[in-house]
Amino acid sequence: MKSPAPSRPQKMALIPACIFLCFAALSVQAEETSVTPQPPDILLGPLFNDVQNAKLFPDQKTFADAVPNSDPLMILADYRMQQNQSGFDLRHFVNVNFTLPKEGEKYVPPEGQSLREHIDGLWPVLTRSTENTEKWDSLLPLPKPYVVPGGRFREVYYWDSYFTMLGLAESGHWDKVADMVANFAHEIDNYGHIPNGNRSYYLSRSQPPFFALMVELLAQHEGDAALKQYLPQMQKEYAYWMDGVENLQAGQQEKRVVKLQDGTLLNRYWDDRDTPRPESWVEDIATAKSNPNRPATEIYRDLRSAAASGWDFSSRWMDNPQQLNTLRTTSIVPVDLNSLMFKMEKILARASKAIGDNAMANQYETLANARQKGIEKYLWNDQQGWYADYDLKSHKVRNQLTAAALFPLYVNAAAKDRASKMATATKTHLLQPGGLNTTSVKSGQQWDAPNGWAPLQWVATEGLQNYGQKEVAMDISWHFLTNVQHTYDREKKLVEKYDVSTTGTGGGGGEYPLQDGFGWTNGVTLKMLDLICPKEQPCDNVPATRPLSESTTQPLKQKEAEPTP
């Protein structure tokens, strides 16, 4: 074995250790200064379990969002006293002791609105304000107004919000962008991280880390002042994602951090709890029971961690795409997450430089460079010719191509020759008449074929453009916009996901009905409208014919789903 080179390499190796120790202190400080609200399954114990198992409501999220009318301990005591009495009615007990969430009023757009006018009209409809909440409410208060996705999603969601904010910025609502960044900074200061959403039952996990990109977006309007203002919160979020790294040995994992055998540091998705999700209680219990060969707690953790990924659920996490109970999210190192961590490190370097701390900036650059090497070494499948996730159990890069493979291009972490191969793979395997497929596998899960999701369309479009692959990028935008326009023309709404095997149809699959609104679709649609139309002639609807200045590629024929990986 070679001895380590003296001097500079040893010194550089110390940098991450120093910075991680500082971050560990930040993480502890955040935990010590906040009181974590308890989720409803803990507050209500057996009552929560009994109500959810009784399936009193079509959507399990309904009772998770219900507000106790008095101290939960008193309600629970009353329940224990009454539950075995003759004639006890559980539904009546719930109606007396809880305030159920109200269904949002169905928005009816004015006649004759263009697509752009419809989206601009929706921003105030989707805006919420919860500076104060009821004492035992699962909803977490936020100091500023925020935009929700829509439908059953009555709270703000972490990674959704970035793509919503792109649209808000496109509409000139920089005040709303600033408010939402302030809200997420507030959550970092109070909870040590940004939860999945502002609900107590989401506090045990985060979502794809877009906060640094949100600050970077705000800096387009406010300049470096935004970077300087939110540097402390960006550092705290980084500490959350890297928590435990200082004690890791090669080949070990701790929470969200993975240390491979050669010392490479990467990240994975993780939820701190290993119980059924309150918002999907019955479904999770059924999934765990369907595979008696695995501990239920292991399945619960992997279900929760998949929710943390934003891809809940997908064949991407499963050994058998037709069986959800084979998912093992925590043993997979995701290419999209590590691309976002690379971007976070780059933005932290930029923000450190903005405050004049060049030494700290260099440390972040060192971390980003190390992660980029890790992405190229472990998250590139050379045999297939695309980026993919790394499997901690097989110690190999996985073979499946997913839309997550475009994230290294989105954050400018990809090697140029590999970006070219990604363009070919995308066009060959994922591009459909209605946009970009999430995967090429039909599993019945919502983050699989034939569904296409707005954030992935934008990541692919921007990522490919970053590397000069404009033709494929514009193909994706044009196909997806056509899908959105056709659906809007028919139904007068934008939806959460789309069937990309055709145009004009919303997506299916998953644990709940198709939702409309819809925050991230609105944001991406506005960005794409302004991408395909000349600035001197902005369009309010998708043009009937594709602009000749862009690619002249003909619409693709529908592809059959590819074999299960």
UniProtKB/Swiss-Prot annotation:
GO terms for biological process: cellular hyperosmotic response; trehalose catabolic process. Belongs to the glycosyl hydrolase 37 family. One of its GO terms (molecular function) is alpha,alpha-trehalase activity. Its EC number is 3.2.1.28. The keyword Hydrolase applies. SUPFAM superfamilies: Six-hairpin glycosidases. The keyword Phosphoprotein does not apply. This is Periplasmic trehalase. It comes from Escherichia coli O45:K1 (strain S88 / ExPEC). PANTHER family: TREHALASE (PTHR23403:SF1). Provides the cells with the ability to utilize trehalose at high osmolarity by splitting it into glucose molecules that can subsequently be taken up by the phosphotransferase-mediated uptake system.
